[in-house]
């Protein structure tokens, strides 16, 4: 708004409030943190919102006046914590700082917004998860006109920016399903969606990202290069841009434009656009991620996930890389084998592995620390951590170089024929040693920066520059002099006093200090005649005179300003040191990336050794054969030796569809998830929990496991099940692995059976993929008679009286019973209900008719002559409640530990339950 257009109300505002209104007008969608002295203040609607969100006291500015406005504030030194809480709630925060030193500025202090913090653009350590990337996602429609429907064809551009690590990747995906799968895989904190893609934005908002924003600004493809040049820390050449599809480049431009506008005046720490070829990865969509609990358990936590089992990395960068590999396993045979070679190398050399992991434990987060330096946000403590990490890096390299005969390994075929030791490693050295040797020999440890940081910083630098105390004594003479004056003020004054006594011959001369007069020289009346002309009289007192001199004034000035001069010098030295680190940021990040890769390989080797995993034989073939496979997560939490391993073999040229039956709790779902997790581990480049494993490459894993609804969308459990099933039938290919659990159970028996039957036929006939299909519909087992590629398997259980024992062992052939009543008993269903259920079950299994003439058994083929089951028969069919209580009490008795007196008391109790006398 131009000044001439300002309303009358604005003219009544104070100058500082006009500053506030101007800044707020530039960022109406953000909460404005307005710096006033030692506080960030918020006004009007922002103040009300923040006071409620953060439980702050709401006050008023100009209380009782016509221009009274709500106000709330937070101390500037504690602002990061409050900002983090607002970001977690999905808000943006604009930070408006004072420009310059208020003590040196007359009148109104200039202010400007220096940064807008959004959920996807965070760099503060305390607001980041050290073991996961913090992505801003940007989605572009490629510049071509399209409809609003999510099902409209692609391509779409997708870019991921992690400001904290300086990573920028971009890809082009062919359709919306792939786009959403990639968004789910990246788990961005914020998604920026082009305005012509409203359905994509709505779908993205349902994912785990905190916010899905609409990017309203048009993006002219002709200006994309200039946008990237303006934002990135180094120009991205036209040749480099030509390597990427246009939709990918446009998405990257959206991400960088948004980041640059949120950090005006600062370059984004990006040097290149990294390609991300989705065709080279094993696709795991959001549903499969959730069902398999790869990185997030059903309760939202990490415990009970595959990541929790395999992540024993010792660096934050290694943890982030492992997480990315877990969510993006490879579908490229050569890449998988290279990773497995590196893991095998560390499996085969436990001593080098241990030394490497010990050294890496001191490396810290070199990647994020170097980026913070580049952004001008690194603290003295950050640089201290960077120094410690660089100091530890040479030991990590030495550990790799210590591997015997590194670099002399012969290429080893991946057919599993080589003899294997306890750790499942092939005899002889791995071919992974050759690239490792080259990396270890050529790795730049940035020794010059390490040496400068070591010479400059104290052992434990402070968290900020406000108090000083950052640099070692002897690093800078000017700083040492200022510190010396501040530290030795008393000694310097006493030395001057002694000098003046000698010069004047006045033994009563004293150098003293008061707040009113500062430092002065006091001489008693008896010696006033000895005072030299260079002394200037300041005050007459009863006992004598007070003076000053040029020498005293100079020393007093040094003492008075020594602390400020030392702090000013330290600040200048720190800025220079941080700039030195920033200049070396590219070298530091290259070192960090390589150490992270070593960390992942050594960590997976350690997991393989401790958990008795083996190297999988990954092939381009069509077989998926696992001998004595184990579920890595269930095994972790099961008692030692209690997990029952099972064999699996799915082959596109043999049995490719397994129909698995058996009772609930027998382990059907565990078995299916186990197979999928072993495939994920193998294709991410990890050893697997099995005795042997042959993995024919899988292009995607699709799952329908468990029961859930979506109240927000108004979808029932059955609707969610059918939607997920439809996605599987649409997306599965011949190379896919499909796991389906209990399709059709959310509707009537006949409808459910019909759907399950048709789905199984479609998987086998139309798609022809490898699939595991668990069901309670025993009628489905008849499918095996129509094709040799469909096989029946069951999870074994045995009856012992009224009890059922789950053996968790896979057997050929269908299950004979479901043992549902036995499971209900284990769950604590009352005995009377169980007895009634047994009676009804017996009638159903005998082929009796239900009320209304419908046949009770799907297996039955006749309707006439069957006795009708009366569902409302008198209660004599059930055990009376008092008898049920007696039965349950007797079941709980441990006869072997029952003393005679306790037995008498028990009999009395049972008689009481039956209504008998005591």
UniProtKB/Swiss-Prot annotation:
Note the Gene3D superfamilies from the entry.
1.10.1420.10, DNA repair protein MutS, domain I, MutS, connector domain, P-loop containing nucleotide triphosphate hydrolases
Pfam families linked to this entry: MutS_I (PF01624), MutS_II (PF05188), MutS_III (PF05192), MutS_IV (PF05190), MutS_V (PF00488)
Q: Which GO terms describe its biological process?
A: mismatch repair
Q: Please give an example of a GO cellular component term from this record.
A: cytosol
Q: Does the keyword Transcription apply?
A: no
Q: Which InterPro entries match?
A: DNA_mismatch_repair_MutS, DNA_mismatch_repair_MutS-lik_N, DNA_mismatch_repair_MutS/MSH, DNA_mismatch_repair_MutS_C, DNA_mismatch_repair_MutS_clamp, DNA_mismatch_repair_MutS_core, DNA_mismatch_repair_MutS_N, DNA_mismatch_repair_MutS_sf
Residues binding ATP: 662-669
Report the superkingdom from the record: Bacteria
Under PROSITE patterns, the record lists: DNA_MISMATCH_REPAIR_2 (PS00486)
Q: Which GO terms describe its molecular function?
A: ATP binding; ATP-dependent DNA damage sensor activity; damaged DNA binding; mismatched DNA binding
User: Does Nucleotide-binding count among this protein's keywords?
Assistant: yes
Alphabetical UniProt keywords: ATP-binding, DNA damage, DNA repair, DNA-binding, Nucleotide-binding
User: Which NCBIfam families does the UniProt record give?
Assistant: PRK05399.1
The UniProt entry's sequence similarity note says: Belongs to the DNA mismatch repair MutS family.
Q: What does this protein do?
A: This protein is involved in the repair of mismatches in DNA. It is possible that it carries out the mismatch recognition step. This protein has a weak ATPase activity.
Question: Per its UniProt record, what HAMAP family does this chain match?
Answer: MutS (MF_00096)
Q: Output the PANTHER family linked to this UniProt entry.
A: DNA MISMATCH REPAIR PROTEIN MSH1, MITOCHONDRIAL, DNA MISMATCH REPAIR PROTEIN MUTS FAMILY MEMBER
Write the protein's name: DNA mismatch repair protein MutS
Task: Give the originating organism.
Answer: Sorangium cellulosum (strain So ce56) (Polyangium cellulosum (strain So ce56))
């Amino acid at each position: 708004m131009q000044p001439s257009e300002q309303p009358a109300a604005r003219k009544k505002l104070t100058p500082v409030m006009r500053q506030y209104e101007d800044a707020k007008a530039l960022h109406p969608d953000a909460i404005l943190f307005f710096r006033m002295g030692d506080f960030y203040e918020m006004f009007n609607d922002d103040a009300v919102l923040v006071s409620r969100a953060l439980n702050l006291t709401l006050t008023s500015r100009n209380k009782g006046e016509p221009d009274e406005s709500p106000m709330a504030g937070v101390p500037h030194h504690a602002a990061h914590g409050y900002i983090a809480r607002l970001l977690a709630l999905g808000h943006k925060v604009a930070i408006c700082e004072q420009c310059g030193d208020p003590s040196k500025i007359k009148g109104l202090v200039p202010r400007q917004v220096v940064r807008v913090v959004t959920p996807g653009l965070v760099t503060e350590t305390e607001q980041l998860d050290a073991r996961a990337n913090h992505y801003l996602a940007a989605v572009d429609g490629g510049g071509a006109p399209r409809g609003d429907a999510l099902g409209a064809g692609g391509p779409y551009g997708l870019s991921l920016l992690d400001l904290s690590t300086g990573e920028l990747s971009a890809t082009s995906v062919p359709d919306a399903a792939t786009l959403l799968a990639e968004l789910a895989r990246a788990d961005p904190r914020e998604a920026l969606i082009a305005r012509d893609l409203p359905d994509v934005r709505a779908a993205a908002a349902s994912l785990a990202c905190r916010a899905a924003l609409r990017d309203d600004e048009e993006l002219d493809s002709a200006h994309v290069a200039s946008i990237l040049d303006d934002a990135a820390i180094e120009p991205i050449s036209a040749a480099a841009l030509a390597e990427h599809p246009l939709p990918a480049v446009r998405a990257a431009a959206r991400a960088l434009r948004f980041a640059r506008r949120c950090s005006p005046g600062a370059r984004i720490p990006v040097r290149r656009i990294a390609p991300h070829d989705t065709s080279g990865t094993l696709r795991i969509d959001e549903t499969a991620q959730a069902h398999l609990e790869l990185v997030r358990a059903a309760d939202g936590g990490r415990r009970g996930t595959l990541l929790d089992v395999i992540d024993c990395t010792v660096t934050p960068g290694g943890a982030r890389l492992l997480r990315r590999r877990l969510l993006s396993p490879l579908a490229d045979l050569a890449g998988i084998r290279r990773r497995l070679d590196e893991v095998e190398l560390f499996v085969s050399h436990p001593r080098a592995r241990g030394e490497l992991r010990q050294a890496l434990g001191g490396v810290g987060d070199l990647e994020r620390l170097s980026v913070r330096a580049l952004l001008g946000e690194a603290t003295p403590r950050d640089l201290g951590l960077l120094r410690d990490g660089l100091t530890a890096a040479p030991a990590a390299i030495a550990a790799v170089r210590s591997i015997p005969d590194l670099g002399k390994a012969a290429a080893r075929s991946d057919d599993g024929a080589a003899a294997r030791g306890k750790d499942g490693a092939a005899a002889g050295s791995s071919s992974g040693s050759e690239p490792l040797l080259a990396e270890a020999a050529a790795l730049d440890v940035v020794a010059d920066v390490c040496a400068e940081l070591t010479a400059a910083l104290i052992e434990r630098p402070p968290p900020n520059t406000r108090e000083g105390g950052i640099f070692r004594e002897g690093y800078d003479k000017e700083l040492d002099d200022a510190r010396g004056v501040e530290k030795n003020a008393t000694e310097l004054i006493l030395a001057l006093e002694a000098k003046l006594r000698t010069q004047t011959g006045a033994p009563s001369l004293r150098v003293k200090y008061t707040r009113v007069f500062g430092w002065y020289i006091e001489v008693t009346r008896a010696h006033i005649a000895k005072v030299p002309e260079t002394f200037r009289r300041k005050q007459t007192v009863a006992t004598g005179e007070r003076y000053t001199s040029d020498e005293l004034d100079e020393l007093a000035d040094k003492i008075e300003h020594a602390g400020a001069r030392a702090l000013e010098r330290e600040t200048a030295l720190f800025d220079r040191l941080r700039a030195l680190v920033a200049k070396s940021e590219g070298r530091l990040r290259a070192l960090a990336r390589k150490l992270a890769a070593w960390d992942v390989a050594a960590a997976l080797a350690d997991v393989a050794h401790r958990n008795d995993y083996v190297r999988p034989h990954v092939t381009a073939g069509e077989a998926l054969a696992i001998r004595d496979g184990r579920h890595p997560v269930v095994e972790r939490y099961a008692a030692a030796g209690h997990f029952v391993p099972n064999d699996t073999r799915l082959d596109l040229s043999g049995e490719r569809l397994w129909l698995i039956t058996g009772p609930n709790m027998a382990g059907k779902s565990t078995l299916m998830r186990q197979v999928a997790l072993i495939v994920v581990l193998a294709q991410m480049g990890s050893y697997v929990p099995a005795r042997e494993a042959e993995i024919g490459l899988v292009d995607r894993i699709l799952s329908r496991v468990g029961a859930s609804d979506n109240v927000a969308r108004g979808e029932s459990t059955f609707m969610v099940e059918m939607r997920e099933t439809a996605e599987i039938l649409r997306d599965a290919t011949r190379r896919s692995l499909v796991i389906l659990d209990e399709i059709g159970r959310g509707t009537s028996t006949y409808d459910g059976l019909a759907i399950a039957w048709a789905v199984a036929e479609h998987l086998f006939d139309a798609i022809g993929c490898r699939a595991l299909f668990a069901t309670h519909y025993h009628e489905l087992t008849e499918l095996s008679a129509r094709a040799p590629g469909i096989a029946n398997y069951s999870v074994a259980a045995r009856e012992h009286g009224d009890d059922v024992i789950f053996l968790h062992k896979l057997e050929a052939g269908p299950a004979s019973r479901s043992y549902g009543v036995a499971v209900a008993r284990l769950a604590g269903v009352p005995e009377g209900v169980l007895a009634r259920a047994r009676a009804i079950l017996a009638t159903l299994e005998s082929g009796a008719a239900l009320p209304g003439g419908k046949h009770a058994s799907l297996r039955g083929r006749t309707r006439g002559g069957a006795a009708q089951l009366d569902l409302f028969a008198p209660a004599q069919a059930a055990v009376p409640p008092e008898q049920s209580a007696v039965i349950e009490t007797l079941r709980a008795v441990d006869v072997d530990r029952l003393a005679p007196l306790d037995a008498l008391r028990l009999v009395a109790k049972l008689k009481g339950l039956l209504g008998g006398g005591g």
